[in-house]
UniProtKB/Swiss-Prot annotation:
One of its GO terms (biological process) is prolyl-tRNA aminoacylation. It is found in: Cytoplasm. CDD domains: ProRS_anticodon_short (cd00861), ProRS_core_prok (cd00779). PANTHER family: MITOCHONDRIAL RIBOSOME PROTEIN L39/PROLYL-TRNA LIGASE FAMILY MEMBER (PTHR42753), PROLINE--TRNA LIGASE (PTHR42753:SF2). It comes from Leptospira biflexa serovar Patoc (strain Patoc 1 / ATCC 23582 / Paris). Catalyzes the attachment of proline to tRNA(Pro) in a two-step reaction: proline is first activated by ATP to form Pro-AMP and then transferred to the acceptor end of tRNA(Pro). As ProRS can inadvertently accommodate and process non-cognate amino acids such as alanine and cysteine, to avoid such errors it has two additional distinct editing activities against alanine. One activity is designated as 'pretransfer' editing and involves the tRNA(Pro)-independent hydrolysis of activated Ala-AMP. This is Proline--tRNA ligase. InterPro entries: aa-tRNA-synt_IIb, aa-tRNA-synth_II, aa-tRNA-synth_II/BPL/LPL, Anticodon-bd, Anticodon-bd_dom_sf, Pro-tRNA-ligase_IIa, Pro-tRNA-synth_IIa_bac-type, Pro-tRNA-Synthase_IIa_type1. Homodimer. GO terms for cellular component: cytosol. Keywords: Aminoacyl-tRNA synthetase, ATP-binding, Cytoplasm, Ligase, Nucleotide-binding, Protein biosynthesis. Consists of three domains: the N-terminal catalytic domain, the editing domain and the C-terminal anticodon-binding domain. It holds the Pfam family tRNA-synt_2b. One of its GO terms (molecular function) is aminoacyl-tRNA deacylase activity.
Length: 586
């Protein structure tokens, strides 16, 4: 491809609304353009990268036995109501009505659609297992689209769904997909960590997210440096360490704490640690009033509580609701009014024999020396793990102190179980002729997000340096010749590269060499060959490795010699990727 007949709309300055490297560089390198909030158009260079990522996903999915489909983006409300998710999906779902007043949505995911499609096609255990997938457009009305294509309202997803006779078969496919995902991400140059995760609205018995460690990540990962346990902080169990010693607050009875409502303010005022305070959090779950008690240095893990309750909505209790129940905001403690309408949950981390500082049930007052046994009978309350894990907590596997990292989620796999199979009555006859409900798995990859995440990992002050497997072009040929005879000579080299199968972009634009160099470094072609004065005088070319910015020179005698040299260099880059893929699949 010649740059003079291609579209390369690069820019020197970062877009004003871009805050992360991938968003800035995708815009500056001419890969995408913003159409509206959370909506992006892919330009030719960007689309080449996207298609290569899709190709890696497709190749590995097919190798793992996946069967590719393409379903409608527009899905009828009936199937969502049948699964019970029409209301659960909330405002993130784009909903619309046609001219006949029929409700539909733009699919944010396709469990329901695939269930309806597959159901009449699987009748016997001999038809299972089956793993179906598509690489298609999805829509989610994100409340705050951000970071360019990392969190957008329209995106490309690879979503796969497997159907099985039993859990043993599901587990086998789940493990196959786990390895397949590691290979997929390694194939595009990403280093991922699989972490235990919350299943959310998807439901099911287990799930794992594939995370890329990054300071811009929206998720927090808990990682054990000893046994390599890893989990999303929303899912990580908090292990009780009764051997840890606490510094007991020296005092008992009523304390005046003027204008001190937050845990931090009270702890500082009383010169004690936050863990010595008893925190009360008042929430409403699907209309049910709930009061949660935690140690003062802990945060409520809303996902854990929602999963325990099985609720759709969890929100803070409002001032009027608290007043109605006789609760004093910021000062809830012993003697608060108990009622049938208020359920109590106690975090499992709380020590029933420890003397805490609790709210005094009146403004500007707390009480020291409070034990849980003085407030509750254990049979009156529910004790569960509902606090957020934090750095230093014991690893749930080996007890070593946990560390934390920020991460970007690029993939998610689920054991869905029979949630959707039962909703849609997907049954097959087993080997004894008895009707058996199938069990399911679900496996998703955010294709656009992968592209941006690669850039987050592969950039420097000059721009992007693409892994060879997904680069828009493998080689950028930069020439400075203007003499027709010299240009004709370069043309023969260009044709030799193209005919050999090398993906090459010849920057033949009528621009200065400095401009061309900056563009090639910004866009991030893995290899750049420069045909300058040395080429015109003695067939000498300069070869640049974009990632390391290392240069070497080659004096060649024939075009075939040049092609052979470049192919060797490209194969070395490819072998590095292939080695990572091979290791990831073990």
């Amino acid at each position: 491809m010649k740059a003079s007949s291609y579209l390369i709309p690069t820019a020197k300055e970062d877009p004003q609304d871009a805050v992360v490297a991938s968003h800035k560089l995708m815009m500056r390198a001419g890969l995408i353009r913003k159409s509206a909030a959370g909506l992006y158009s892919y330009l030719p260079l960007g689309l080449r990268v996207l298609r290569k990522i899709e190709g890696i996903v497709r190749k590995e999915m097919d190798k793992a036995g996946g069967l590719e489909f393409q379903l409608p983006i527009l899905t009828p409300s009936e199937i969502w109501k049948e699964s019970g998710r029409w209301d659960k999906m909330g405002k993130e779902m784009f909903r619309l009505k046609d001219r006949h007043d029929n409700e539909s949505c733009l699919g944010p995911t396709h469990e329901e659609s695939f269930c309806v499609l597959v159901k009449p096609m699987v009748r016997s255990y001999k038809d299972l297992p089956i793993n179906v997938y598509q690489i298609h457009t999805k829509f989610r009305d994100e409340i705050r689209p951000r970071f360019g294509v990392i969190r957008s309202r329209e995106f490309t997803m690879k979503d796969a769904y497997s159907f099985h006779l039993d859990d043993e078969s599901l587990d086998k496919t789940y493990q196959t997909m786990r390895k397949t995902y590691r290979r997929i991400f390694a194939g595009m140059g990403l280093t991922t960590i699989p972490v235990q995760a919350d299943s959310g609205n998807m439901g099911g018995s287990a799930s794992e997210e594939f995370m890329v460690v990054s300071p811009i990540g929206e998720e927090t990962l808990t990682i054990c440096p000893s046994c390599h346990y890893s989990g999303n902080i929303e899912k990580t169990p908090v292990i009780v360490n009764r051997n840890a010693t606490k510094q007991v607050f020296d005092g008992k009875g009523k304390l005046h704490t003027p204008a001190k409502k937050s845990i931090t303010e009270v702890a500082e005022f009383l010169n004690t640690k936050e863990e010595n305070l008893l925190k009360a959090v008042a929430v409403v779950a699907d209309g049910q009033y709930i009061l949660v008690f935690l140690e003062g240095d802990r945060e409520l893990n809303e996902n854990k509580l929602k999963n325990h309750l099985g609720c759709n909505e969890l929100r803070p209790m409002g001032p009027a609701e608290m007043e109605k129940l006789g609760l004093v905001p910021g000062f809830i403690g012993p003697g608060f009014p108990k009622s049938e309408s208020l359920k109590i949950y106690i975090d499992a981390l709380l020590d029933w024999n420890f003397s805490y500082i609790a709210g005094g049930n009146e403004i500007d007052h707390h009480i020291a020396g409070v034990q849980l046994t003085s407030i509750f009978k254990e049979e009156e309350v529910t004790k569960i793990d509902i606090s957020q894990a934090k750095v230093g907590d014991p690893c749930p596997s080996c007890g070593t102190g946990l560390t934390a990292e920020k991460g970007i989620e690029v993939g998610h796999i689920f054991k869905l179980g029979q949630k959707y199979s039962k909703a849609f009555d997907i049954t097959v006859l087993n080997d004894k002729g008895k009707a058996t409900t199938t069990t399911m798995g679900c496996y998703g990859i955010g294709v656009n997000r992968c592209m941006a995440t690669v850039i987050e990992q592969c950039n420097d002050e000059k721009g992007i340096f693409w892994p060879v497997s997904i680069a828009p072009f493998t080689v950028c040929l930069v020439s400075i010749a203007k003499n027709p005879d010299d240009i004709a000579k370069i043309e023969t080299i260009y044709k030799s590269l193209v005919e050999s199968g090398i993906e090459v972009l010849w920057d033949d634009r009528d621009l200065g060499p400095g401009f061309k160099f900056k563009d090639s470094e910004l866009i991030g072609f893995p290899i750049r060959i420069t045909l300058g004065k040395g080429f015109l005088e003695k067939n000498e070319i300069t070869i640049l490795d974009r990632k390391s910015m290392a240069e070497d020179t080659l004096v060649y005698t024939t075009n075939e010699e040049l092609v052979t040299h470049l192919k060797l260099k490209i194969s070395q880059l490819e072998e590095t990727i292939e080695k990572e893929v091979s290791l990831a699949g073990t």
